[in-house]
Amino acid sequence: MDYKTYDPDLWNAIAREEERQENNLELIASENVVSKAVMAAQGSILTNKYAEGYPGKRYYGGCEFIDIVENLAIDRAKELFGAKFANVQAHSGSQANTAAYLSLVEPGDTILGMDLSAGGHLTHGSPVNFSGKTYNFVSYGVDPSTEVIDYDVVRILAREHRPKLIVAGASAYSRTIDFKRFREIADEVDAKLMVDMAHIAGLVASGLHPNPVPYADIVTSTTHKTLRGPRGGLILTNSEELAKKVNSSIFPGIQGGPLEHVIAGKAAAFKEALDPSFAEYSQQVIANAQAMTKVFNQAPEARLISGATDNHLLLIEVTGFGLNGKEAEAILDSVNITVNKNSIPFEQLSPFKTSGIRIGTPAITSRGFKEEDAVEVAKLIVQVLKDPENTAVHDEVKAAVAALTKKYPLYN
């Protein structure tokens, strides 16, 4: 029996999700559209194989071809980011961060990381996350007037609290991060430096954002987002000693068997990112985001956090529309534009409502959108948020979205 006929509930849901992605404008900054090669690798026969251990040192037989796949991913990751060592087995960015902490600090140690509401990540010390429960996190944020990182304040906090580790990187921060400054601050207080480049890895690979690898003791990342690979994690270092700790922290520390079909997807994505065309794509991602900023900066109801973007994302306060982030997300979803509600610096609302939304351009750029298309999308967002109860406006925006998705299909 055909598997789709056997399980129609499952395959109908998958078909509807495929339809949603085809007909919606995906503006969630952490999402992208993988290539057919990445998708094929993830759906390959490698999903059948267990391979605990590392290439050449497996606990299972029959891994000779699995070793080739994993070594391809490792070697390509090292070349892509200029690192001496790479671990490609982490199932996610959070798993990568967990392994980094296990390799660098002990439970109860003090760590300096970016506050979640200022743009950090759950794994950078949020009290509801394992990181905040296991380590003594002290948070830094952004300057109230500029909404960018104040490195002088980071230095003051580091001198005051003497952390064993400083974490740089963010999940909702639109400006360039100065990793050299972070390294200097870490050295002043004899701290290690970890960089979580999950959101900007593709831009780093393309030379469009400073590379943290020369400055950090350990760099972690996801392999999706701007890198346009499968959902997974990556850990890089130039230290052989730390590489050994990272490997043992991943296996047997926090994981068992690696997902070799996902690692194959990573290898495929890394090869794509090494091609010169990927740098052109990354440049377009930034150009599209910066084109959108002009629209939001001209709309009096919208407030662009920090006033600009240097990367793929924009953080926008929407309270000027008389809305919170949850409401704005729902309104935009109703016209087939997908964003996520997001806290803003010095947030006054709960994380379930928020004052802002986060917008990213990786997915629409993968579909082929250029600056003029990004401008149109930004104008549609402003149009519907200004008049959320007007059904005529909804219909007009929906029609414009449909025209754009038809012009730029998900897969040509």
UniProtKB/Swiss-Prot annotation:
Its EC number is 2.1.2.1. InterPro entries: PyrdxlP-dep_Trfase, PyrdxlP-dep_Trfase_major, PyrdxlP-dep_Trfase_small, Ser_HO-MeTrfase, Ser_HO-MeTrfase-like, Ser_HO-MeTrfase_PLP_BS, SHMT-like_dom. It catalyses: (6R)-5,10-methylene-5,6,7,8-tetrahydrofolate + glycine + H2O = (6S)-5,6,7,8-tetrahydrofolate + L-serine. Homodimer. One of its GO terms (cellular component) is cytosol. Its main location: cytoplasm. This is Serine hydroxymethyltransferase. The gene is glyA. It is found in: Cytoplasm. NCBIfam families: PRK00011.1 (NF000586). Gene3D superfamilies: Aspartate Aminotransferase, domain 1, Type I PLP-dependent aspartate aminotransferase-like (Major domain). It holds the Pfam family SHMT. (6S)-5,6,7,8-tetrahydrofolate binds at L116, G120, H121, L122, E241, S350, P351, F352. It comes from Enterococcus faecalis (strain ATCC 700802 / V583). One of its GO terms (molecular function) is glycine hydroxymethyltransferase activity. The modification N6-(pyridoxal phosphate)lysine is found at K225. Keywords: Amino-acid biosynthesis, Cytoplasm, One-carbon metabolism, Pyridoxal phosphate, Transferase. Belongs to the SHMT family.
